[in-house]
């Protein structure tokens, strides 16, 4: 059997002008992953990332750690199948529509007025609103032309996963640097969970964590979820 490792990118820049950029902590998280793998002699046969900067940068940091240690690291491939869903687009296009009809969402948004998005309270309020909007998105209740549907997103991710399964069928270890949504879509494929459960699992995927699957032509099995043995201190654990 082969092994597939899905790595969530290091912490991005939530609340900043450009989210798609690793924070200083995200850079540190990525470095410790690379260091942990090098120390344990982790051999990778193939490495991929999505097209987003935070995904590619996480891969680059791990690659740099390997090369600085004189360890082999394969040339990476970029595959848009592993891009995250467009959370900004979903909120931009669906939130105004839902605010007209969802009183719970209206109340949450009203509470957010004047609160710093990066404060603990601001993050909590954002997450509550985000979950309501995302529930509508995955249910397909409110579709807009500008936003990729949940069904299309899942199909896109699984196309990428199935290509890896076909291209690296036996005795290989493949790493993919991606995001929480793509990891949750792959989890759903492995454990056959309902859509809402799959999306909920995405909320708890830690930055810089590793989720592991073992596969062959007949099986695709989850063998490790959200693993962060490379984080020596709780201060390194983030979810957004």
Region annotations inferred by a language model:
Residues 10, 180-181, 226-229:
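Active-site metal-binding loops of divalent metal-dependent hydrolases
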Residues 38-127:
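Phosphate-coordination/substrate-recognition cap region in phosphate-metabolizing enzymes
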Residues 68, 85-107, 146-147, 151, ...:
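Acidic, low-complexity terminal tails and accessory targeting/binding regions
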Residues 115-167, 178:
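Hydrophobic, aromatic-enriched interface-forming segments
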């Amino acid at each position: 059997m082969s092994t597939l490792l899905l790595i969530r990118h290091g912490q991005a820049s939530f609340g900043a002008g450009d989210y798609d950029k690793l924070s200083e902590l995200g850079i540190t998280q990525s470095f410790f992953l690379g260091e942990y793998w090098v120390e344990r002699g982790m051999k990778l046969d193939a490495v991929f990332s999505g097209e987003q900067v935070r995904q590619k940068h996480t891969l680059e940091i791990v690659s740099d750690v390997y090369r600085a240690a004189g360890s082999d690291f394969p040339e990476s491939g970029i595959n848009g199948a592993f891009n995250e869903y467009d959370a900004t687009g979903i909120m931009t296009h669906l939130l105004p529509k839902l605010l007209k009809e969802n009183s719970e969402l209206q109340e949450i948004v009203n509470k957010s007025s004047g609160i710093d998005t990066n404060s603990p309270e601001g993050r909590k309020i954002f997450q509550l609103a985000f979950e309501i909007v995302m529930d509508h998105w995955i249910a397909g209740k409110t579709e807009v032309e500008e936003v990729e549907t949940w069904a299309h997103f899942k199909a896109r991710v699984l196309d990428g996963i199935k290509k890896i399964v076909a291209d690296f069928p036996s005795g290989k270890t493949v790493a993919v640097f991606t995001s929480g949504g793509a990891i949750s879509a792959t989890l759903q494929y492995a454990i056959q969970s309902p859509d809402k459960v799959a999306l909920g699992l995405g909320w708890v995927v830690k930055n810089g964590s590793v989720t592991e699957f073992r596969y062959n032509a007949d099986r695709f099995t989850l063998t490790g979820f959200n693993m962060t043995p490379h984080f020596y201190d709780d201060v390194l654990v983030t979810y957004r």
